[in-house]
Amino acid sequence: MIIHPNFDPVAIHLGPLAVRWYGLMYLVGFILAIVVGRLRLKLPHVAAQGWSAKDIDDMMFYGVLGVVLGGRLGYVLFYKAGYYFSHPLDIFRVWEGGMSFHGGFLGVTLAMALFAWQRKRHWLEVTDFVAPMVPTGLAAGRLGNFINGELWGRVTSPDAPWAMLFPGASRDDAAWLAAHQDIAAKWNLNEVFLSHQMLPRHPSQLYEIALEGIALFFVLWFFSRKPRPMGAISALFLIGYGAARFTVEFAREPDDFLGLLTFGLSMGQWLSLPMIVAGVLMMIWAYRRGGVAKQA
């Protein structure tokens, strides 16, 4: 078993200002997205569409607004609506955590629609350009989750070489142990808990980095290196992210205030299913429609 390093959540102290790892990872994610976007400008079929470095910079402004506003509102509405309706001022306490990818996705989608309208481009032309830029940002965000020791995975066997002990999960571990003595006996978890006051869990944040970040990036990068029908790259992102998130959720601990929902699926899985369906339908539409994005 591996013990999580339990990093200090504050990366840098600048006088009275504390720069947290999670916020720093958001910054890294946006920088990586810009780098990927500029690399895409070197592709002949992308350059022929008239994209420029200034377009990328402007996109990032819209993207940051979409991620922050959409991510926060998505968390409020999808995960803890009852609490925030009773404590509306807490919605603005973003530094305490609480962001939703699916909310951020909707926020960025709306932001890119506004960008497309202002630039007189088709909305899907914009999202096709942006889609390969997203996974590196997702990977950075999940790395922030891992550094913070949050959003850990479900309990697993201590014999698994990747099993990890998360100090922040100790309270949840005690409750889990009391409710699952059958599994605890099978995996000798009572002995593990007595020794460490923690239970071995999946490092699901690392799984998400591997699937939603690295794997999805390479899939989208190589797929988008050739001209594709408008909407196809966006569709592949929807399918790829939805499938990756749906899969990882089987190893990720459900939110304690929600638990598992209908059919034993988590909220993250239920929110990912529409993405997969929409992606498949969009891919079919894109290839039936044919053609590629117009050239400048």
From Swiss-Prot:
The keyword Glycosyltransferase does not apply. GO terms for molecular function: phosphatidylglycerol-prolipoprotein diacylglyceryl transferase activity. One of its GO terms (biological process) is lipoprotein biosynthetic process. Its EC number is 2.5.1.145. Pathway: Protein modification; lipoprotein biosynthesis (diacylglyceryl transfer). It is a multi-pass membrane protein. Pfam families: LGT. The chain crosses the membrane at residues 17-37, 59-79, 97-117, 230-250, 265-285. Belongs to the Lgt family. This is Phosphatidylglycerol--prolipoprotein diacylglyceryl transferase.
